[in-house]
Amino acid sequence: MIIAGFQSGHDVGYCLLKDGVPIIHEELERFIREKEPLGDGLDMLFQRLPDVDLENISHFSYGNPGGMLGKWADRCGKKEPRDKMNKLISQNDGKFFIIGHHQSHAANAFFSSNYDEALIITIDGSGTDKKDWNDVTSEATIDNSFSTAFTFWKGKGLDIEPIERIPMQKITIGSPWRIYTREIFGLSSGHPYGLAAGTVMAMASVGDSEKYWKDFYNSFKAGGGGPSSHTMENCRKYKPIADKSEQDAFDVAAGIQKATEVIAKEIMSPYIEKYNPKHICMSGGVVLNSVMVGKMYDWYPNVEQIYVCPVPYDGGLAIGSAQYVYHQILRNPRVEWKDNTSPYLGNLYTEDDINSALSKYENKIEITDSSDEDVVELLTEQNIISVFGGGSESGRRALGNRSILCDPRSPDMKSIVNEKVKHRQWFRPFAPSILRESVKDWFYKDVDSPYMTTVLDWKEEVKDKVPAVVHLNGTARLQTVTENDNKWYYNFIKRFEDKTGVPIVLNTSFNDREPIVETPEHAINCFMGTNIDYLYFYDLKLLICKKKV
């Protein structure tokens, strides 16, 4: 059984779910090379899969009822599938479903996990849900829907059921964050460069969080989803402060981060105390705040694991809506994941695809047959190496298939990569990819973080061994790696450990101020335009370097 899910508006994309397993998930930004573009996910499906046979797709799902659905006449590629979809939508013969925004987030969080029972929490800026959450066929209207930004669900077996859906008029965290990022710090807050909230989080880690947090707390409580009076007043008050000096900007950022943590804990605690879950599943754009997720282990010591799905922001609505249809509506059994659901859902590129891309640069590059062992050796010689293989990662994080890798033992590597490759601020941290079985030896908490969603404290006695992946406050947003997660990457880190005694490599996304590279040609373009030393196509064992002029 194949179900097609799609997301339109921003974070545009589509997915195909086969027998409950996502087999492909692609986002528009990876192909047009601009972050957070507006568009139509169904049109993207037809453009990317022009030969798709709609008769082979059992059901369609749309996880954003607040988007204008309407007819697809002017938006979908070929006439035949376009006409079929218009007929499906108008007649809705049991094949087309419109799932609530947070309902889709919750489904993605729970059904992507291995838990039979969990408390599900979704947090974002805002999203449209239907008042009757069992209504999965009608479009959202003013009368049948409302906007929420913080919801709680009970997940058990094949079902998720709402416990509480808090209207955004009472609380919203995501919307003020977007406004503060732009208005106070002058950073990008959307298309074409993406939301730079991660930069603000990095700043917050070296600021004084006690100075300003109460004003920002009040703006989150004001809700409303847009530029509320509290939010705009804070912009007017704190922009001049942030402009004074770098440290002042850090202090303002720290206030925003602390306010986020205080209000999130305040809202979550009654539900966690009441239900006392062993497992929490989370989704929604705000849970990309990995600092908050990491602190939840301190707040709630009885919780064994906090699971954040690979695509928690709105790009994951395509996956979540399809999962909801497959499990909760059609009553198909859960999927047992080997350790974790795979985030490597992008297209697989052939040897011909790679050679064709390389041929365009044949006068500028040298190509040699290589091996993983050779690449590990190059890492230990302090080279910066980009890797490309398998399907690209879904989500915001590169997890070994579209990554830039470095030796974490180098005290200079962080500044080198920030300045010469990523072209970003000096204080931005880099993530450690660590063998799952080694986490307990390096961090104070021994938990899973397969999609780089959790910030933890390094153990004092070992952090000096890997200075390139230790943030200024002694933390890291780690990626835990098992052999089932990514066999090639796991074995590569193992080889690095065998040579150095360190089961960790520095991992950052293979890009330079653009979306993560998707195609072989994107990879070569990025490689040629930066100070990356080598590009390694690990499936073919091809090592690329630039010809010396």
How would you label these PLM feature ranges?
Residues 1-4:
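Extreme N-terminal starter segment of soluble prokaryotic enzymes
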Residues 43-58, 267-276:
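Phosphate/pyrophosphate-binding loops at sites that engage ATP/ADP/AMP, CoA/4′-phosphopantetheine
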Residues 254-278:
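Phosphate/ATP-binding catalytic cores across multiple sugar-kinase/actin-like superfamilies
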Residues 51-89, 107-108:
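Short beta-strand-loop/turn "lid" adjacent to the catalytic site in phosphate-handling enzymes
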Residues 29-39, 251-254, 258:
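Active-site pocket-shaping loop/turn-to-helix segments
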Residues 202-258:
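Active-site cores of enzymes that catalyze phosphoryl transfer or operate on phosphate-rich substrates
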Residues 54-67, 276-285, 386:
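Short glycine-rich phosphate-binding loop at a beta-alpha junction
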Residues 7-35, 82-94, 101-107, 111-219, ...:
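Flexible beta->alpha loop and helix N-cap segments adjacent to enzyme active/binding sites
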